Structure formats: C-alpha cells, structure tokens
Amino acid sequence: MKELNRTVPFLRIALIWHVFVLQLCAADTFIPFQEASEVPDDVVELWQDYDARREPLEVQIIKEWKTDDVITRYVTFKVGTFKGSDARLAAYFSFPNHPQKHAAFVWSHGGGQRAQKERGIYFAKQGFATLDINWLGRPLEADIQVNTDWGKVDPTQGPQFYSKALRKSWKRNLQPDDYSIDPIASPRNANWFLLAVAARRAITFLEEQPEVDRERIGFAGYSMGGMITALTAIDSRVRAVVPFVGGTGFKYVDFPGRIEGSSIRQHFRNLELYQSTIDASVYWPLVTCPVLFISSSNDFHSTFERIYQSLALLRHPNWRVSTNVHQNHGPGPEQWVLLNLWFNQYLKDIEEDIPETPPSTFKISGNSATFTVTPGQQERLVDTEVYYSYDPNSRTRFWISADTKRSASTWSAELPVHERLPLYVFALCRYQLRKSVQLQHDHTSTFVLNSLEHSIIPKSVDLNVLATLPKTRTVFEDFDDGIQDWSTRDNRSIKTYKFQSPDLDRSNDKKLSLTINPLGKKLRLRINLESQFLSRPNNLGKFSYTREINGNKAQTVVIDRDDFKNADGKTVEWPKIATCEITIVDQETQAKLDLTQTAGHEILRKIELID
C-alpha cells in the first residue's frame, strides 16, 4: 500500500504534464506525430489536412514607401505556431500605385540571398504586385530590426544560412531534433516542409490584399527558392510557376558512371520516405499549371537531366525550358526576360506568343545518331545551336557545339555513338523579342528556348572510355567563333568548361600557353582554375595564377602546372580541372578588359596546351 501511495503523486504529475503537452500542441499549427503509423507516406497525405487559410495572418505593416508609380510595404505575417511559439515571416509587398486589382506573384529568394525592395519596385512598374519573402531573415533595412523569426523551429540547412539558426550543424534529413515539428522521423522534419508552409501562407497573404486579383497569382523562386516553388506548385491557387536554378526532382539518384557526390542520398536514413514525400519528383505529377524552368546548362543545383526528368512527370504539355550554356547557377538576360513574358501571358492574359518547345527528333543507327530540330516561328528566329556531350556529369561537362546542316526549316546534326558512354544532345533556339526589354539589372532584345534533351545511356557506363576518344581539338581557343565555348557573368571575364572536353589532349606533360598582345598597356593577367563538382576524388580545389604583362607586340605566356597556387599546396592536373576563368585588368585604370568582344580578342588572341 505504501508503494502504491508513493506512485500516485508521480502518476498525477505525469497526467498533468501530458495534459499540458496536449494543450500546448492543440495551439500548434500541426499536432506532432507520436507513432510511426501516423506519419504520411506520400505527398498527397502529407498535405491533405493543411489549410493555409485557416489561421489568421496577423499582418503587421512595419514601414511604407510611396511614389507616384509604386507602393512598397515592409510587412510581417504569421506562418504558424510550432512548439508553442509563433513563427513570423518578413517580406516586401510591392504593387502599382493604381486603384485596381493586379496580377501578383510570390518571389522566394535563394539560400545565399534575401528579399529585395528594388525587385518588387521593378515588377510593380511592369504591372505586378509581388510579395518578396525574406525566409532566411537576413537584414533588409538598416533602421528596421523587426524581421523573420522562426521561433522554436529551424527551417534552414545550416547555421550559415540564418542568423538566428538554432542548429549548429547541417541538417538535411527527416530525423527529429529539438528544432523540428515531430519527435519521430517524419517529412515534416525536413526544412523544405516548413518553407513550403511559409510559401503557402505567402499566397494567402496575396489573396487577402485588396490590391491583388486573387485569381491571378503565380510563384517564382531562385535556387532554394526554386525548390520551394516546386513544392508549392501543387497549390491549386497558383496559376503559373517559374522555378529558377532549382526545383528538380531525383536528387537522390546518382549520375551514371558512379560520380561521387552527385546525389544527396547519403544524407538520409529514411530515403524511401524522403522520395515519396519531399523530393520534387513526387510533386511535379500533381502540378496542373504552366511551368517555365529557367536554369544554366551546368547548374549544380538544378542539374540538366533532372530538369527534363521532372518535366516528363507533368500531365500537361504547357512547359518550357531556357538555359544559358556553359554557365553554372547564373541565368542571363535571355532567360530572365522570360519571367516577364510567362507571367504576362498566364497571369495577365496578355498574349506574348511564346513559341512552343522546339520540336526535335533523335534516331540511332549503329555507331551514329541523328538529331534534328525544327523551331517554330522562324520569322523571329535569330539562331539555332546544337550541343552534345558524352560526359554524364552535367555539372562539369563541356557542351560541344555540333556542326549542323540546314534543310528548309530543320537543322540536323550527325553525332558518333561510343560504346559504354552516354550521349546527350539538345538545341538552343534564340528568338527576337518584339522590342527590347529593360530588366531589373540588364536589358535584352532576344530570348532563348531549349528543345527537349535527348539521350542514350548504356546500362554500363565506363568513364575511362572518355580518355580514349580521338584528340581532334588541336587549339584550346582561337576565338574564331567568339566566345561560343565560354560564358561570362560580368561581360568582362570569361569562363569555360573546355578542360573537360574529351577531344582535347589534356596530358599532364602539357603546358598552358596564352598569346597576348598588350597593345602598349600595362596589364595584369589572372587565371582561376577550379575542380568543384567533379567526382569527389577528382576535386583538387581551387588554383590561381597572376602575371603582369606589357609591351607593344604579341607575346607568348607559357604556364607550367606548378606555377598555379593552391591553398593546400596541390599541383594542377589538367584532366581534373572543371572550370577555367580568365581576367585581364588594365593596371592604369584598374578596369577589367572586355574579353567577350572582338576588341578583347585583339589582346587575348590564342590559348593552347603545348608540349
């Protein structure tokens, strides 16, 4: 009896604590799962009971800026209540200063970014209302301390993303910790789930604003924001979406050829649960609105093949892809302008006459493949380029420009097929705009649409075969075709993936030779080499080389592998170089020379790998 009497108080305390926890959870947006049997095992079940309109937003207007054209408000609103604490998001809400309802969209920034007032002002001048959500909580205004506060949950992948991050290390899995919703493995413990909840609440915010036409709402985002776009695209309130450099599915699938580090599967103890509830591949089949993927041909996050694998899951044909070639994570003006056109067409119902995805064919006969493309609206067509590669690593492959033949309205390319190597091919079609368009940071009179990417992938891929292909590229670069094999971020420096071209002799007994004519100027040459995103064992890191050059005639600069500096004391290996970036600075003005134009090629004339 004494033992029973001693037990009763403990039972009472446990009961009181249990009731307290239930009351606490009852106020939460989501009641935590306690048993594995409660955990949803597919995306429909995961979201079926969530109503993004149910809880009041409790909007606060922190500050307003007003001009004759645009009104911008710094606002915060409630995402939800998690672990008994409110999570609130800061954002810029911008709209045209006209008394009418406007088409609108949510913009979700990337993992290294923040919301931008200027972006909202630009799009307001284009006739859109926008909500630019600051989901990472980085500072926005020097005189405003109020910002995003996630309370007791942490939706970030690591402390470097968010100043108020509660975790001290990376987290990508579905396991529970002190800052997740559920105490057991659950898709709601993924950072993406919380970010998608915030995105849906952002749509609710737009719905409730008198300046917004709630029937004309879209969603767009960059990088991590592109993934948020993909997860939010299944919301029936969304009329069109534009994921930038993010949003692809199949991130858990390694590239062919056992390329180490090409997937995120190693992060998951519950890989099947991630596949069925969080990976974008289970969202795209449920998306019914028009989709525009904007990316780069060598994007590390939105990898090239995964874009097309994701779009193949759509149950409608209303999609486009636009990428800039030889670039990573950096769409150019010819891609950015399509955001304006896409939302004009599908949110404002303005007919922009965007061409269909250029029709293409791909046929294999023995050791040869034939690719054809027949772009539509050829009266507006400026250029058609065909690119191919045998390298399964889409992050670092060099896209080779194919020789094409034109017959009437069709371009064709004959490509060799090699045993135990994949082959990838697509066309890039450049179109003229009706008039030049001023973008937020640039302007353009053309835009680009990709064809479908075609490929053959053997069951067994042997990357060693790449090294045995004929070495037909005798000159690294002579600029006879301009910077066709290069890209640029600043319209000054140029970057290429050409060290990954299998038709180039990259033997380590070679030296890098540059022919440069300073034209009487005092110049500083800088070359940056990187191995990032190659298969993990081949990632040597970063290398740099600088040299001063002057004179009035052409001279040859010969650089040995040992001349490049590396923080870890490593030596360059030519086959293990992913990117090569070249910058030349005028030391008198400290301005970079423009290496994208003919004038720059009068100075930087030729690049070779020599004995």
Region annotations inferred by a language model:
Residues I121-A196, T248-E260:
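Cap/lid segment of the alpha/beta-hydrolase catalytic domain
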Residues V287, F293-S295:
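Short beta-strand/loop motif that positions the catalytic acidic residue
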Residues Q345-Y388, I400-E414, V465-R473, N508:
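Surface beta-strand/loop "capping" patches
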Residues V475, W486-K570, K576, T583-I610:
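Extracellular ligand-binding interfaces
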Residues A90-F93, K101-G110, T130:
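Short beta-strand element of the alpha/beta-hydrolase
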Residues R200-R265:
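Primarily recognizes the serine-hydrolase "nucleophile elbow" in alpha/beta-hydrolase
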Residues D49-P99:
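N-terminal cap/lid segment of alpha/beta-hydrolase-fold proteins
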Residues L314-G330:
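Catalytic histidine neighborhood in serine/cysteine hydrolases
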